Amino acid sequence: MMKILLTALGFCLLTQMQAQPDRWQQRVKYTMNIDMNVQTNQFQGKQKLEYWNNSSDTLTRVFYHLYFNAFQPGSMMDNRSLRQGNIKRGSTPDWDPRVRDRIQNLKPDEIGYQKILSLTMNGVAQPYKEDETILEVKLTKPILPKSKVVFDMVFEAQVPLQIRRSGRDNPTTKVRYSMSQWYPKMCEYDYEGWHPTPYVGREFYGVWGDFDVSISIDSKYILGGTGYLQNANQIGYGYEDEGVKVKKPLGGKLTWHFVAPNVHDFMWAADPDFIHKKLKARNDLTFHLLYKTTNATAVSWEKILTDADKALPFIEKTFGAYPYKQFSFVHGGDGGMEYPMATLLSGPGAWLHEWLHNWYYGMLGTNEGEYPWMDEGFTSYAEDRVQAFLDNASGFPYEGSYRSYYALVKSGKEEPLTTHADHYNTNYAYSIASYSKGDIFLAQLGYITGDAVRDKILLEYYRLWRFKHPNISDFIRVAEKVSDMKLDWYKEYWV
């Protein structure tokens, strides 16, 4: 009898392990219509959000992110930055130099905000309350397991002066609008529960879904970002099909219509002076580049396209296939910063790192707050490998990460990799842990398993967990299966 029970238990455990990549996930579909006023830097928005509760839980409330509200004097993001400014590394303040004390000095027409004007679920008005960057909605009727509801929202927003990631009018790049985290975004609900994480300028975590976005804006503006432009032959600006003579609608505005399938965020940027170039990397993939020559030459910008084309076969062979039909490198007010199918770049130098984020942030989608090193570190590792390929270099590609990590250890400021991204005591410790120590995690894994096996692990991890929000235990489980080695000790010692 004991033998039968043990056999049954073993079968159940094996079945559970094999089924792990099919872990349930919520699903969303956004349909949004935006009307932008480039004189006031404000926009009106309508959002229809179809929400699938694929969990076995009954949901009595939901949460939205309202990221723009962080850019107001006295916000949590403002207070955190001021606190970090009082922490010194030598004589250098620990604050992000892009943020510093700038939020507290914003004028009323320079702050960011997102105001909810109305919200219904299945046509019934819902009570809600704002707490800075989080909107809590206590539902009048619960969302049952395995059911779908529809939220309709009317909102208005003001684009903040460029400080961090999203914003307007960076004086160096002179890009007018860098529109990330610009819409009320449903928080993620997963096997751990809700993740209504206040925004203090760090990481993101989103629900997989489809986006249908229409943006009405001054007809002189050129847009780039996430998604496929649906009305390219009416818009023009280099998006139109070859040979098409564009006939733009009459009036002072154009409506740009984008769709983006199976992504967890949507970014766009806009400027009247963008130069738009594109390169067909293969039959089903086009690279777009939108830039200005305000802080870098056209030659340095356009080299991105040829280098990306050269790197693509190596990247896909080593880390997995890129599944979308386009990728856009977009000059922005802050960056590099990664988004699905696109990146914002303040200059051409960070293009490779930000593009490679689309494998780890974009397609694997680990919770960046809990595991920032599995995004930044794995991306840094991939960047080291790809840059060595592009440079035809034979040296040790991870040297920079090792040097940075050694410096952190010697400083006495190292914190465990298990620290939540928002809870590191210093920005310095967070940065080195997330980028350098995460990079070294994969480099040393190759020392343990052998480089060829480590590469097989990365491809199998991508194959099994693409679009499924994996965590570190999921990665270790794949690594153990592929290598036929016990690796929990490595996770425990290093993480």
Language model regions located:
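Amphipathic alpha-helical substructures
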Residues: 431-495
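Zinc-dependent metallopeptidase catalytic helix centered on the HExxH motif
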Residues: 340-401, 458
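Hydrophobic helix-coil surface modules that form long, contiguous segments used
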Residues: 185-193, 201-352, 381
